[in-house]
């Protein structure tokens, strides 16, 4: 029986270059990480995650995960844009206790510069609330969040969401309806950018 001829395998790993990924201007253009690629065009639309602690050094914000997408490459640096954030599930679970109510109020908001975002606030009550109270609280949170977003630019809104300033505004407004333990914006996602 004839032996099959061995084909020479080309090592594509040697062709790859390393690119430094930078965070957007809003987060200080810090280095998030590095990634290999054969062609800079292959980097576009890649998604990267980083915690707030990695970007700011603030250990108290360890539970906030920021999501970025590479939108341009210049030389060996890839710049990103913010596409959303999420709070870790173990942090959310640690807030919820027996005898409390969890009020979720996801809402689509539009900023004054034309960005559309889906924002997911979570309110936790001190004691169990009636469904009518929860419904009223949900409506109040949604209205207040739409109002806040319409007055801010995209960067101001993202900064407020990530730092917790908007969550504290919502807390002070919603606690008038029912005593609250905590309000947190657990998730956000950019849906549309202005043309």
Curated annotation (Swiss-Prot):
A GO CC annotation given for this chain: ribosome
Pfam families listed in its UniProt record: Ribosomal_S3Ae (PF01015)
SMART domains (alphabetical): Ribosomal_S3Ae (SM01397)
One GO-annotated biological process of the protein: translation
Family annotation (InterPro entries): Ribosomal_eS1, Ribosomal_eS1_arc
Domain of life: Archaea
Family assignment from sequence similarity: Belongs to the eukaryotic ribosomal protein eS1 family.
Protein name (Swiss-Prot/TrEMBL): Small ribosomal subunit protein eS1
């Amino acid at each position: 029986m004839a032996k099959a001829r061995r084909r020479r395998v080309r090592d594509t790993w040697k062709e790859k270059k390393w690119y430094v990924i930078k965070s957007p201007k809003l987060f200080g253009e810090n280095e998030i990480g590095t990634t290999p690629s054969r062609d800079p065009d292959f980097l576009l639309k890649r998604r990267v995650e980083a915690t707030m602690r990695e970007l700011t050094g603030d250990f108290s914000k360890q539970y906030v995960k920021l999501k970025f997408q590479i939108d341009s490459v210049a030389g060996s640096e890839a710049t990103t844009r913010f596409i959303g954030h999420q709070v870790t599930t173990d942090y959310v679970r640690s807030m919820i206790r027996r005898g409390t109510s969890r009020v979720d109020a996801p809402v689509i908001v539009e900023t004054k510069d034309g960005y559309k975002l889906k924002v997911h606030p979570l309110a936790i009550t001190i004691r169990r609330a009636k469904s009518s109270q929860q419904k009223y609280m949900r409506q109040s949170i949604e209205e207040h969040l739409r109002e806040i977003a319409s007055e801010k630019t995209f960067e101001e809104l993202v900064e407020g969401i990530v730092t917790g300033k908007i969550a504290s505004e919502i807390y002070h407004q919603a606690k008038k309806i029912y005593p609250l333990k905590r309000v947190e914006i657990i998730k956000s996602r950019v849906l549309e950018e202005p043309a």
